[in-house]
């Protein structure tokens, strides 16, 4: 379910990214993830809620990829796209590692994942807000 929803969400985000502001779409995706995660931990866990969570979160998970790549290319151009997106991708992997590692440490300390979920929700809300001031215009390059 998550994988199928990922494909649909990524294709939809790419389509919408051609027509609407990428920063607002990214903000909306991060806010959507935050709302979905909050609902998931606030409501009773049932097979139906897990299926809904999987589909909803799956549709938003990789939807950031085409929008982020498009935003980097639009602002900085294609000349350094590989390097810049490599930095973005590396930082994402670093955050993934830290999230899993710290999540395990917090589980060892507290005996459950509640704090990890709430930190993730806070990071999602921060991500939604931090995209809003992005200026979606190309940076002009001045040759010395």
Can you describe what each PLM-predicted range is?
Residues 10-22, 107-108:
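Helix-to-loop junctions at the C-terminal end of transmembrane segments
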Residues 32-45:
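C-terminal ends and interior cores of transmembrane alpha-helices
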Residues 49-63:
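Hydrophobic core of transmembrane alpha-helices in multi-pass small-molecule transporters
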Residues 63-76:
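Intracellular juxtamembrane helix-capping segments at the cytosolic ends
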Residues 78-87:
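Loop-to-transmembrane helix entry/capping segments in MFS-fold secondary transporters
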């Amino acid at each position: 379910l998550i994988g199928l929803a990922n494909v649909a969400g990524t294709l939809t985000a790419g389509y919408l990214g051609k027509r609407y502001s990428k920063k607002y779409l990214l903000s909306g995706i991060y806010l959507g993830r935050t709302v979905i995660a909050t609902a998931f931990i606030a409501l009773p866990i049932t097979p139906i809620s897990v299926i809904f969570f999987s589909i909803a979160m799956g549709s938003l998970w990789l939807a950031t990829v085409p929008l982020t790549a498009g935003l980097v290319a639009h602002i900085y151009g294609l000349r350094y796209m590989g390097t810049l997106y490599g930095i973005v991708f590396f930082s994402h992997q670093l955050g993934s590692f830290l999230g899993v590692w710290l999540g395990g440490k917090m589980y060892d300390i507290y005996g459950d994942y509640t704090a990890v979920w709430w930190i993730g929700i806070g990071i999602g809300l921060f991500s939604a807000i931090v995209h809003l001031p992005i200026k979606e215009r190309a940076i002009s390059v001045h040759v010395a």
